[in-house]
Curated annotation (Swiss-Prot):
Disulfide bonds: none annotated. The gene is rsmB. GO terms for biological process: regulation of DNA-templated transcription; rRNA base methylation. The keyword Plastid does not apply. It comes from the Bacteria. HAMAP family: 16SrRNA_methyltr_B. Specifically methylates the cytosine at position 967 (m5C967) of 16S rRNA. PROSITE patterns: NOL1_NOP2_SUN, SAM_MT_RSMB_NOP. S-adenosyl-L-methionine binds at residues 253-259, 276, 302, 321. It is found in: Cytoplasm. This is Ribosomal RNA small subunit methyltransferase B. Belongs to the class I-like SAM-binding methyltransferase superfamily. RsmB/NOP family. One of its GO terms (cellular component) is cytosol.
Amino acid sequence: MKKQNLRSMAASAIEKVVEQGQSLSNILPPLQQKVSDKDKALLQELCFGVLRTLPQQEWLISKLMSRPMTGKQRTIHYLIMVGFYQLLHTRIPPHAALAETVEGAVVIKRPQLKGLINGVLRQFQRQQEELLAEFADSDKRFLHPEWLLKRLQKAYPSKWEAIVEANNQRPPMWLRVNRNHHTRDEWLALLETAEMNGFTHDAYPDAIRLASPAPVQALPGFEQGWVTVQDASAQGCMTYLEPQNGDHILDLCAAPGGKTTHILEIAPKASVMAVDVDEQRLSRVYDNLKRLGMKAEVKQGDGRTPGEWCGDEQFDRILVDAPCSATGVIRRHPDIKWLRRDRDINELAQLQSEILDAVWPHLKPGGTLVYATCSVLPEENSQQIAAFLKRTSNATLRTTGTPDKPGVQNLPGAEDGDGFFYAKLIKE
């Protein structure tokens, strides 16, 4: 495999996220196919790391360069950020970080700027201590966009700093043991045999947190469906959905299929319809079902128009894993901070409201609907459910909060899980 310049690849990917609004989860996998296995993790670290600390990198450039790079030279702007990130946040020897970053200018076809890149990075090395001290007192130190900080400060006056700090950390790797193959303790023993360590959590009966992240190929029985990568908070949905054998269950907004397969692990004889609006992402649902040896009825469809894909069908249980701002999973997807806009929140809340109203008639009397998001914003969560309860006379809240403050809100980093919201509704 031809040796690639990872720094230039990372710079191009970061530019596409920040300048073009593309998602890193779409950009990164094809790039990783071009590099050796040992370089895949470094490429991901450079992309995730720069996006996690973007305001710091932008601030440093503003201090060390008289004017920003524009036009066709714009990628160099992000290449310099990749250089800063390596010097500040990785164990890469400084001489190697500098050499590889400067060489990236050749790959980007801007060899005439090698001297500029080298000069800026070396100047940073000389002034690093005083620059970082100044940054620590700047309003950029929280590494979040201003609109999101304001919303977090309003919603969580005493907790917003802890949320921000959790968002800026690297996430742990959580797994879900397939109880149809092994008990959690049995699989934990297999993990230890493979010379890896994991920890259990009392609140999540199938969950194991790895002591340190590992490639899925290294996990015992991953290809055979013994275990799935899924955050503990996402696993928590089943605490409220409580799927049973014989149930007819709708998993709405189902891609990539983590919750669909969890339902079938708990209730193998349930009949499950998994629906998502994004046809491309449904391929992940099929992949997960195949790996785990499970069957579900998979359909492409819009949650606002269920009549188009299920007629007048009714379900015993419905999981609405609603499209949301994903502000609870920023530590896993740091590009969210730069892809989301303040105006998106009201639009998402409206979409969620329309989905709830549309699917409620498809829940059988006495049935359970669990509304879940990976957001921490009240507009998408407690306020959304409070408004739904107010306008829906036959909906009752169960075991998740109170009518004036409905739902259960997990905050990022609490018990090492992602930020997640759940509300359990019963149809009278």
